[in-house]
């Protein structure tokens, strides 16, 4: 994925060095966009191996509306451990906002179910939007949503998705986000009778942590390989019925993992 390497290089060359919430320090740019045509392969990094199991289980966890890490722990996923409390709770994070956004009248809005309904009944709508950024509840979240709003677009039988990510940890987080939302787009396309189109990733504060510079430069020495193909069980027609076993990634050849510390 040359597109991702171009982002790394751009931020290293043109970013501004800034202090940040974690005290680590970053080099960042404000405003950057990447586009991935999902017909050209599944956009997962080949210049370092990603833990696909974590990506899939996290997405299924979001779609369940879950906000406790028990499901993730049961499936060997540790990416949320640093933020959970002693009971494994994270507060009203992504899954809660996606599936149970609290309305002023006491109702809870299932944004994902509403999205699916609109894709069936009014696919030309400009309101095919899901938001995880709820100002009334941000302070109750263990970590406010970094990937905070996404919109779908249907044209010529293809479903495209654009994600706005307010805060983008380029070395560790962004590769996960690309693969996760690409997969979500493919899943929703399948259950709505559409073909996958593009995934467009729009970044706000796009940053590389100062203790990731060496790792980023190592990754830039590597050559991207052909993208793998994601196969999804064609029998699944209900978005909320997908299981881990319904996904198979063929042809994934990647360079070794590059370890880097997480800024909490």
UniProtKB/Swiss-Prot annotation:
Major site of localization recorded for this protein: cytoplasm
Organism placement in taxonomy: Bacteria, Pseudomonadati, Pseudomonadota, Alphaproteobacteria, Hyphomicrobiales
Top-level division of the source organism's lineage: Bacteria
EC number, as in UniProt: 2.1.1.45
InterPro entries found in the cross-reference section: Thymidate_synth/dCMP_Mease, Thymidate_synth/dCMP_Mease_dom, Thymidate_synth/dCMP_Mease_sf, Thymidylate_synthase, Thymidylate_synthase_AS
Subcellular location: Cytoplasm
GO biological process terms, semicolon-separated: dTMP biosynthetic process; dTTP biosynthetic process; methylation
Binding site for (6R)-5,10-methylene-5,6,7,8-tetrahydrofolate: 51, 169, 263
Database matches in SUPFAM superfamilies: Thymidylate synthase/dCMP hydroxymethylase (SSF55831)
Residues annotated to bind dUMP: 21, 126-127, 166-169, 177, 207-209
The encoding gene: thyA
Subunit structure: Homodimer.
Keywords from the UniProt entry: Cytoplasm, Methyltransferase, Nucleotide biosynthesis, Transferase
Role of this protein: Catalyzes the reductive methylation of 2'-deoxyuridine-5'-monophosphate (dUMP) to 2'-deoxythymidine-5'-monophosphate (dTMP) while utilizing 5,10-methylenetetrahydrofolate (mTHF) as the methyl donor and reductant in the reaction, yielding dihydrofolate (DHF) as a by-product. This enzymatic reaction provides an intracellular de novo source of dTMP, an essential precursor for DNA biosynthesis.
Catalytic activity: dUMP + (6R)-5,10-methylene-5,6,7,8-tetrahydrofolate = 7,8-dihydrofolate + dTMP
One GO MF term: thymidylate synthase activity
Name of the featured protein: Thymidylate synthase
Cited CDD domains: TS_Pyrimidine_HMase
């Amino acid at each position: 994925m040359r597109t991702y390497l171009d982002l790394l290089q751009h931020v290293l060359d043109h970013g501004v060095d800034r202090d940040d919430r974690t005290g680590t320090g970053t080099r960042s740019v404000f405003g950057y966009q990447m586009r991935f045509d999902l017909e050209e392969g599944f956009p997962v990094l080949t210049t370092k191996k990603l833990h696909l199991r974590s990506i899939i289980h996290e997405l299924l966890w979001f779609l369940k509306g879950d906000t406790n890490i028990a499901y993730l722990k049961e499936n060997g996923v540790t990416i949320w451990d640093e933020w959970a409390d002693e009971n494994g709770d994270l507060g009203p994070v992504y899954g809660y906002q996606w599936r149970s956004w609290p309305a002023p009248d006491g109702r809870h809005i299932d944004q994902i179910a509403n999205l699916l309904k609109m894709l069936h009944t009014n696919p030309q709508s400009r309101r095919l939007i899901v938001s995880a950024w709820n100002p009334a509840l941000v302070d109750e979240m263990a970590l406010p949503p970094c990937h905070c709003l996404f919109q779908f677009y249907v044209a010529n039988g293809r479903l495209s998705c654009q994600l706005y990510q307010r805060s983008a940890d380029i070395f560790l987080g962004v590769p996960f986000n690309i693969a996760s939302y690409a997969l979500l787009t493919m899943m929703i396309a399948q259950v709505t009778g559409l073909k996958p189109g593009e995934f467009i990733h729009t970044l706000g504060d796009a940053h590389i942590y100062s203790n990731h510079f060496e790792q980023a430069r190592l990754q830039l020495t590597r050559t991207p390989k052909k993208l793998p193909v994601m196969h999804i069980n064609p029998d699944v027609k209900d978005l909320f019925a997908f299981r881990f076993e319904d996904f198979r990634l063929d042809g994934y050849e990647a360079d070794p993992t590059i370890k880097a510390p997480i800024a909490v």
